[in-house]
Amino acid sequence: MTLKELAIGCGTTLRSIWMIGMQAFNKRETRMYPDVPVNPPPRFRGRIVLTRDPDGDERCVACNLCAVACPVDCISLQKAETKDGRWYPEFFRINFSRCIFCGLCEEACPTTAIQLTPDFEMGEFKRQDLVYEKDDLLISGPGKYPEYNFYRMAGMAIAGKDKGEAENEAKPIDVKGLLP
């Protein structure tokens, strides 16, 4: 090692110390997380919840599209039917230890039952505690779409109404009446 190389090494070290010392007077970029709350961006995809209709019924019709759309297969559900013919999930289970929070289940849901919230604090000590059942996922409100009711929009008979009598729905067309 020559004297020239030693001088260059010392100069580089002193320059690095100078640059680091100048950063001591700048504003910190790091936030002290538990003390300072973190505000995620508006389209942040966090914890998954199941919402209800404005009437208070479950929105989920157990169509299984969310489970099919999930790339890591963390959603499982079983369909059941009420006496009036309405479908609902008998059980709905999400394994959050496998979930990658991609949001494909929310996009696939035709009833807007699945919605992603900005909650991100889901740490647990046991992996079994990250498996959420329907009772854990179901919230009391309608979520992002307060006025939407799938059965009213889809035209399924509600409380004795026939097809065509629901909100924003036309009467069924008689195809035989169109023939010459």
From Swiss-Prot:
Binds 2 [4Fe-4S] clusters per subunit. GO terms for biological process: aerobic respiration. It comes from the Bacteria. It catalyses: a quinone + NADH + 5 H(+)(in) = a quinol + NAD(+) + 4 H(+)(out). The keyword Cell inner membrane applies. InterPro entries: 4Fe4S_Fe-S-bd, 4Fe4S_Fe_S_CS, NADH_quinone_OxRdtase_chainI. Keywords: 4Fe-4S, Cell inner membrane, Cell membrane, Iron, Iron-sulfur, Membrane, Metal-binding, NAD, Quinone, Repeat, Translocase, Ubiquinone. [4Fe-4S] cluster 2 binds at residues 70, 99, 102, 105. Pfam families: Fer4_7. One of its GO terms (molecular function) is quinone binding. The keyword 4Fe-4S applies. Its EC number is 7.1.1.-. [4Fe-4S] cluster 1 binds at residues 60, 63, 66, 109. Gene3D superfamilies: 3.30.70.3270. It is a peripheral membrane protein. Its cofactor is [4Fe-4S] cluster. GO terms for cellular component: plasma membrane. Disulfide bonds: none annotated. Residues 48-80, 90-119 form the 4Fe-4S ferredoxin-type domain. It is found in: Cell inner membrane. NDH-1 is composed of 13 different subunits. Subunits NuoA, H, J, K, L, M, N constitute the membrane sector of the complex. Belongs to the complex I 23 kDa subunit family. NDH-1 shuttles electrons from NADH, via FMN and iron-sulfur (Fe-S) centers, to quinones in the respiratory chain. The immediate electron acceptor for the enzyme in this species is believed to be ubiquinone. Couples the redox reaction to proton translocation (for every two electrons transferred, four hydrogen ions are translocated across the cytoplasmic membrane), and thus conserves the redox energy in a proton gradient. This is NADH-quinone oxidoreductase subunit I. It comes from Sodalis glossinidius (strain morsitans). The gene is nuoI.
